[in-house]
């Protein structure tokens, strides 16, 4: 009976037209609706943005206070201290492509490909950071050599570990959403929090260790100098209080670091691209590096931002000396810095609105160039505190654009790269790590140029007044040199090919690629189901 039923069924099937038979077999294949636009909630964006604070908190504290800490609190000699700072910066720049290479070789896990780096580097990073601000009791006569090795080791170790946090965090921009607009919005949130991080880092470190200043005495020529004798006769209790103040500040910043990392880990989930997930393994690093460095839009973008970053870093690196010696606003430096950072914080949302309304290239031209008139004003004006505050607030507007725009434009370059090289997964960390590398390279160049220029101008170390040529050199480093670099950077941005029309085309092409990958995945699933049924 069963055999006869099977024969009738086969015979009926043979009488049906092929098209009808195929249609009758298809009900198991449900046509999937196009995916709705992926929208990140405000909570998701805030959790992502908070992850940018640790790098800025620690970097700001180290940038402004490590030198004076090594010299006056840890009692490291000036030459070893300068070696620690220089080697630390050089190592910091080197670790970015190194970590980018390691991440590109990482495989996807249940937590993602980037999150494990963030999770496992965090506890080690805060331990290394805390030990930077700890003064060990070395045996008598070995303080100088042992102290040099101690601070060099933990400074380089911390820079390595914080890079293991920051490079994957930067690359995470590409994996929080497949929508350009959502990534841009999340980047704006991130830049706002990062600027707030610099403000908080400066405030915490500055307020807690504000009393950690070497005493000054009037010398016979009428100039105020740091008294070596006073430093040596400083009471042990007072020095111990200063050391404890640095440890307290380090503990608070380390706690904020952990809290921010915890929020990031809980609130953000990596999203893997469909067309990438179909690739068996990541592209070899050096092959990916050749492709990335051969991608024209990326080279033009980092070249433009290399010049503009160098301009702003010249201002940043010499701002304290400029306020102290050229403008003679010794007691206003922290307040002026706070005015710049608060202005940047409040104007980042405005720049985010501007770039979505008028385009990113337009935002670059207006945002970066807006600093030029105020830099000219600083170069020409006489000493005036009110005008200086106005310039500081206006400078914050440009700083906000300089913070936001590179990180908003990098994802566009990566999207363009993926369209040209769709079978090259794992290259995102290379893009971000080498951008950070070139940024830190610019920081090192600005430090070297500034120090050399001041040395040629006969800068008097530890003095509270300087020769006129030093004041003039500082004015050039803070005004004319940045103006020239900004103009060169803007000229390079003229060559940058990804405008708003190109972005829209890339967005449509990427969407088509995702839909193709999705339908391919559905076909593979249906084939597997059919095979199991048969």
From Swiss-Prot:
Glycans are attached at residues 221, 231. Its main location: membrane. It is a multi-pass membrane protein. It is found in: Cell membrane; Endoplasmic reticulum membrane. Changing residue 439 to A: No effect on LPC transport. Residues 70-80, 134-148, 213-232, 325-335, 381-383, 458-469 are extracellular. It catalyses: a 1-acyl-sn-glycero-3-phosphocholine(in) + Na(+)(in) = a 1-acyl-sn-glycero-3-phosphocholine(out) + Na(+)(out); 1-(4Z,7Z,10Z,13Z,16Z,19Z-docosahexaenoyl)-sn-glycero-3-phosphocholine(in) + Na(+)(in) = 1-(4Z,7Z,10Z,13Z,16Z,19Z-docosahexaenoyl)-sn-glycero-3-phosphocholine(out) + Na(+)(out); 1-(9Z-octadecenoyl)-sn-glycero-3-phosphocholine(in) + Na(+)(in) = 1-(9Z-octadecenoyl)-sn-glycero-3-phosphocholine(out) + Na(+)(out); 1-hexadecanoyl-sn-glycero-3-phosphocholine(in) + Na(+)(in) = 1-hexadecanoyl-sn-glycero-3-phosphocholine(out) + Na(+)(out). Changing residue 309 to A: Significant reduction in LPC transport. Changing residue 194 to A: Significant reduction in LPC transport. GO terms for molecular function: fatty acid transmembrane transporter activity; long-chain fatty acid transmembrane transporter activity; lysophosphatidylcholine flippase activity; lysophospholipid:sodium symporter activity; oleate transmembrane transporter activity; symporter activity. Belongs to the major facilitator superfamily. Sodium-dependent lysophosphatidylcholine (LPC) symporter, which plays an essential role for blood-brain barrier formation and function. Specifically expressed in endothelium of the blood-brain barrier of micro-vessels and transports LPC into the brain. Transport of LPC is essential because it constitutes the major mechanism by which docosahexaenoic acid (DHA), an omega-3 fatty acid that is essential for normal brain growth and cognitive function, enters the brain. Transports LPC carrying long-chain fatty acids such LPC oleate and LPC palmitate with a minimum acyl chain length of 14 carbons. This is Sodium-dependent lysophosphatidylcholine symporter 1.
